[in-house]
Amino acid sequence: MTKQAEETQKPIIFAPETYQYDKFTLNEKQLTDDPIDLFTKWFNEAKEDPRETLPEAITFSSAELPSGRVSSRILLFKELDHRGFTIYSNWGTSRKAHDIATNPNAAIVFFWKDLQRQVRVEGITEHVNRETSERYFKTRPRGSKIGAWASRQSDVIKNREELDELTQKNTERFKDAEDIPCPDYWGGLRIVPLEIEFWQGRPSRLHDRFVYRRKTENDPWKVVRLAP
């Protein structure tokens, strides 16, 4: 069968357009001078919505150079300040660590289904200082701290038993430790935004979209409306 013929075959999965976005609108009067302020408002509204069970979930996308291959994964956003959005992870062995080491550009997306809203952020990444990483690490459950030591994230392992054995070894290693230290390869990464888009779903896919842009962190924000 030719490639063209394959493309005309019935798809394995077909998702017809049935869902309508019809709850809210977004217009110029609702915008703020600083997009961080509008994001904070939207995020707090998502937190207060009982149907948004994990408002801090994000899609984090990075790209390795020189290949340009993009990788994405779901992570949990942890901190926000006026410089940017911070996540925490293994920066020694993970796929995203390799990507960021070759290309500091990254993007994150928040999607709140019940509120029919999406926020897309593009920017430059930077590692937070050690003090900040250790401060956050102390708030993690003990099991998660041990897990950070046990797992060389994204390395190939033989089976689940290997991971369980490493976890047990580190559980024994730190059994007398009141405070488990933060590994030197583990810490925070801040995405300093250069572009933040606010998307509000509207009927017939005629969504409201506004994007804030700046060339560098020190430049003022400019905002424009985009066609849906």
UniProtKB/Swiss-Prot annotation:
SUPFAM superfamilies: FMN-binding split barrel
Record GO cellular component, one term: mitochondrial intermembrane space
Binding site for FMN: 73-76, 88-89, 95-96, 118, 153-154, 199, 209
Enzyme class: oxidoreductase
PROSITE patterns: PYRIDOX_OXIDASE
Cofactor annotation comment: Binds 1 FMN per subunit.
GO biological process per UniProt: pyridoxal 5'-phosphate salvage; pyridoxine biosynthetic process
Biochemical pathway: Cofactor metabolism; pyridoxal 5'-phosphate salvage; pyridoxal 5'-phosphate from pyridoxamine 5'-phosphate: step 1/1; Cofactor metabolism; pyridoxal 5'-phosphate salvage; pyridoxal 5'-phosphate from pyridoxine 5'-phosphate: step 1/1
The keyword Transport belongs to this UniProt entry's keyword annotation: no
EC number(s) stated in the UniProt entry for this protein: 1.4.3.5
Gene3D superfamilies: Electron Transport, Fmn-binding Protein, Chain A
MF (Gene Ontology): FMN binding; pyridoxamine phosphate oxidase activity
Domain of life where this protein originates: Eukaryota
Compartments where found: Mitochondrion intermembrane space
Family annotation (PANTHER family): PYRIDOXINE-5'-PHOSPHATE OXIDASE, PYRIDOXINE-5-PHOSPHATE OXIDASE
Family to which the UniProt record says this protein belongs: Belongs to the pyridoxamine 5'-phosphate oxidase family.
HAMAP family: PdxH (MF_01629)
UniProt name for this protein: Pyridoxamine 5'-phosphate oxidase
Gene source species: Saccharomyces cerevisiae (strain ATCC 204508 / S288c)
